[in-house]
UniProtKB/Swiss-Prot annotation:
Matches recorded under InterPro entries: Aldolase_TIM, DHO_dehydrogenase, DHOD_1B, Dihydroorotate_DH_1, Dihydroorotate_DH_1_2, Dihydroorotate_DH_cat, Dihydroorotate_DH_CS, Dihydroorotate_DH_I
Pfam family of the protein (one): DHO_dh
Its job: Catalyzes the conversion of dihydroorotate to orotate with NAD(+) as electron acceptor.
Protein name: Dihydroorotate dehydrogenase B (NAD(+)), catalytic subunit
Subunit structure: Heterotetramer of 2 PyrK and 2 PyrD type B subunits.
Positions bound to FMN: S19, K43, A44, N97, N125, K163, I189, G215, G241, G242, G263, T264
UniProt remark on cofactor binding: Binds 1 FMN per subunit.
Keyword Cell inner membrane: no
Main location: cytoplasm
Organism field: Bacillus pumilus (strain SAFR-032)
């Protein structure tokens, strides 16, 4: 009842640890078998290694956290030689998150990493708010987003999903531009831009000044955006933003997501993903659903059916 079929991804269940909140899985593999996961979104990979932003770069908030990590990663060579081979021991498809500062960077990383035998899809990171160049610059302009998507699609050996930024005036317009450029799916949402101030100094707590807000605080925004975008495109969506339990997963499915990524909750409870997987069948049954597929987009498909009958 939990299996989901998406472009490039045959998922045993719809639960995926989100990129940036799971590293490359090594720490979590000491706690449970990663093969139970529907898929794994690995940490963003750039062409060259990145050390990220200066510290402090994480701050707790009332209902979540701010981060300004800055895409710290070992670079394409390190991921291809060390991380992906290590992940081959697990029976779960890998989604490689690709980031860069310019189109050529994305293209080179995508072309090479998509050929790794356990990478089943790419997640194009065009929405990171914590880097000075690239990242969110591509995610806030429909034409730039479409051009980058097409460039990556032209070289990728696997389906391409594009990660959407919530820090835009019209997320539907950007989603449609990306779909028109050939994207196979969308992941959404990335973090909202936020800030915390130190009351003693009056200065921002984060060295980067601003950071990406994640956690329960952003879930209503994420659900609303998934609900809107899923009605405007025909490609599948992997929803994310503030998921803490199986009820949250069901809410994203009803809004129109076909699978759900769990991010910040992994920092609070490292067992959260397997716990949600175990809990989900009972939650679906409690609300009268016999499968994940039956839930997808129910919130608006129900309205459309009622309107059609009227």
């Amino acid at each position: 009842m939990l299996n989901v079929e998406l472009p490039g991804l045959s998922l045993k269940n719809p639960i995926i640890p989100a990129s940036g909140c799971f590293g490359f899985g090594r720490e979590f593999a000491s706690l449970y078998d990663l093969s139970v996961l529907g898929s794994i979104m690995i940490k963003a990979t750039t062409l060259e290694p990145r050390f990220g932003n200066p510290t402090p770069r994480v701050a707790e908030t009332g209902a979540g956290m701010l981060n300004a990590i800055g895409l710290q990663n070992p670079g394409l060579k390190g991921v291809l030689e060390n991380e992906l081979p290590w992940l081959e021991q697990f029976d779960t498809p890998i989604i490689a998150n690709v980031a860069g500062s310019q189109v050529d960077d994305y293209v080179e990383v995508a072309e090479q990493i998509s050929q790794a035998k356990n990478v089943h899809a790419l997640e194009l990171n065009i929405s990171c708010p914590n880097v000075k160049t690239g990242g969110i610059a591509f995610g806030t302009d429909p034409q730039m987003a479409a051009a980058l998507t097409k460039a990556v699609k032209d070289v990728s050996s696997v389906p391409v999903y594009v990660k959407l930024s919530p820090n835009v005036a019209n997320i539907v317009e950007i989603a449609q531009a990306i779909e028109s450029a050939g994207a196979d799916g969308l992941t959404m949402i990335n973090t909202l831009i936020g800030m915390r101030l130190d009351l003693k100094t009056g200065k921002p707590i984060l060295a980067n000044k601003t950071g990406g807000l994640s956690g329960p605080a952003i879930k209503p925004v994420a659900v609303r955006m998934v609900h809107e975008v899923s009605q405007a495109v025909s490609i599948p969506i992997i929803g994310m933003g503030g998921v803490q339990n199986a009820e949250d997963v069901l809410e994203f499915l009803l809004a129109g997501a076909s699978a759900v990524a769990v991010g910040t909750a992994n920092f609070v409870n490292p067992f959260i993903c397997p716990e949600i997987i175990e809990e989900l069948p009972n939650v679906l049954a409690a609300y009268g659903y016999s499968s994940v597929e039956e839930c997808i987009g129910r919130s608006w498909k129900h309205e459309a059916l009622a309107h059609h009958r009227a």
